[in-house]
Amino acid sequence: MKFQYDEFNPNRFEVHRLALDIIEPNSRVLDIGCATGYFAKQLLTKHCETWGVDRDKSAVKKAAKYCQKVIVSNLDEVTSLPVPKKYFDYIIMLDVLEHLLHPENLLSMIKNNLKDNGKVIVSIPNIAHASIRWLLLTGGFEYADTGILDKTHVKFYTKQSSQNLLNKCGYKILDTVPTNGMCKVPLLYKITDRLPVKWQYFIVKKIPTLFAFQFICVARMTRTRIRPAIKK
C-alpha cells in the first residue's frame, strides 16, 4: 500500500500521540508500516532505537533518516523479518492490520522478535463507529481515499473482534485505548465540535464502541491460549 501519512499528528487524543505516550524512553521499537518515518522521528525525542518496515520503497528511503535500520517487505508474503530475535521492547503497527489479507500470520510471526516482557501496540479503525452505522442506516457504504472505509482496507474490525484477533494469535490484552472520533459523528458534530477536546474524549471513553475512531490495543505474549472476548 502507498503510505498515507508523512506527518505526525500531535493532537492529544489522536492515534499518533496516544501511541507515542505508551512507549517508554530508551526502548527498542520495531515500527511495522513505518511509512516515511514520521513516528520514528518522534521516538528519537524519547531516545528510542527504532527499526522500520514498509513495502513502499520511496517511503522507506525517507524513514531511513530516523531509523537504525529499514526493511522493505510485503507483509502478506513474508514468513519472517530480518530482525533480531527477542530484541524489541515494543512492536508497533499503526493502522496496518486492516490492509493485510492474513494479519494473524504477521502477529504470530513477530512474537519471536519481542523480548519476553515486550509489548505490541496495534491501532485498528473502528468499523462500528457512529459514522459507519449512519451510512448503513441510510443505505450507504462508499469507500474513500482515507478513513475507516479506506479503499485499501481488506479487513474491518470492532473493538471486540480486534481483541479476539490478538487473543487468537497468543497475546493477552493489557489495555484498549479509544481515539477521539467525535468530530466524525453525523448530525452531532456541529454540537460536539464546540466542546473542549477533553470533554469530547470524555464522551468517547464513556461509549467507545460508538464514538472511537480507532482502538489502540496494547498486548503482551502469553503461553496459554486466551478465550475470545465475550461481548458484554
Locations of regions flagged by a protein language model:
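A short glycine-rich, Lys/Arg-flanked "PGG" loop and its adjoining helix->strand segment in the class I
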Residues: L107-K119
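Conserved class I S-adenosyl-L-methionine
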Residues: V122-A144
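A SAM-dependent methyltransferase catalytic signature shared across enzymes that methylate proteins
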Residues: S162-V177
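Conserved N-terminal segment of class I S-adenosyl-L-methionine
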Residues: M1-K86, Y90, E104-L107, T138, ...
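Acceptor-substrate binding/catalytic loop of class I
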Residues: A144-S161
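A short SAM/SAH-binding and catalytic strip from SAM-dependent methyltransferases
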Residues: Y90-L101
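Short N-terminal helix/helix-N-cap motif within the alpha/beta-hydrolase-1
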Residues: L101-N105, I132
